[in-house]
Amino acid sequence: NDVGFYLFKLPFVTFVLDWLFMAVAFITLLVVATHVLSGGIVVQPPRPKVRRATKAHVAVLLALLAVLKAGDYWVTRYELTTANRGAVRGVTYTVDNAQLPAVLLLALIALFTAALFLVALKTESWRPAIVASALWAVMALVGGVVYPAAIQSLVVNPNQKEKEAKYITHNIEATRHALGIDQVTEEQIEFGSLTRTEVEDNVAALQDIRLVKPDEQMVTRFRYDKGKPGQTVNDLDPDRYEVDGTLRQVVVGASELDLDQVGNKSWQGTHLINTHGCGLVMAPAAQFQASGNPAYRDDIVDLDRPELYFSPSLTGYAIVDTTVNETPCPGAETADYEGDSGVRLSSTVRRLAFALDEFDYNLVGSSSINSDSQVLMLRNPRERAQALAPFLSFDGDPYPVALDGRVVWVIDGYTTSSRYPYAQTADLSQLDPGAGLDHTLNYVRNSV
């Protein structure tokens, strides 16, 4: 089967089989209880008395349970490609030579038991089916647990290098492909002495070597030098923009809203008036001022709409298009939200619903809100993207980009899975907590 079968079809089939088995098991218990209460089953010594119709009813249900379990055993063969038994993840010597044969045998026993339950409908003798069920239970213990453990301990562990060699090779190949490193090539590069001619031929590149590093110390410097009232710089990212007609490396940060610094901390101030940050702060990465500060530039990009209604530090909600004027960005007279990313409060019912959701009665009582007003929620770009596509994993460091006169946020998304056959589980313990890959996986692609 192709990889898509293991990542998509197999989990669905497993879920359906498990759900059906649990449902039929519950129905069987319910049916037995009903027959006991209605007299179909009379508990008396030396053995219960069961009506013929009741036997048939229960026999069919037990046969169905056995068939479903046989299907589960059959699907388990594919699930073993991600087993954790042996030196590596996936099919190992023990899985291949002990567990797989045992699972196939259990599937056959389950089908045989189902057939005997159906035969009991005619013969009215449950003894063969009961004996088969007992044999099934013994084989499940011996073949599913004892035998594989014995093979692992007595055969594999003393001869692991010989027994597991080909399975380790399969694991390495699958892991490299699952993590996207199977196409990596190595090249040996030898560097000679740097000559004057080489320096003169690469002056432009040398002049653009990054000196301003986007580290925490530089974030503090940007925040101190370029911070505006009610706004702050929380993060810096490297990027490239055209500076004086030449594409240059720059360090860029978003001037985000900081409600802790605003003067008006009333409900209107924090939800209707101070609703956004303002623009970007930039500095060429290869330049410093004589004072030692970055060479800040305000003319690298021209923003028609510098307002940042969404940014990583924003929490809670904001309401726009109200009768209250929002705080304008520097150089602007007014700030009017022109987007449609909010939920319009077009009725009293909607206002009441949001008030209950936020436990905030001001959403109902405020006279500043009208039918054109919008509620902006999930204003953190990562949280917003995660709500939109919960099946993806998103990087914890969105970065701002000036595009078409406004600021947009770019965020990396990953497709991940823990079900790639034969591949080893990735060790994520050394990743930055904000990397977005905080769960068990053995397959990842930076696809989004």
Where are the predicted features?
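Soluble extracytoplasmic regions of secretory-pathway and membrane proteins
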Residues: 1-448
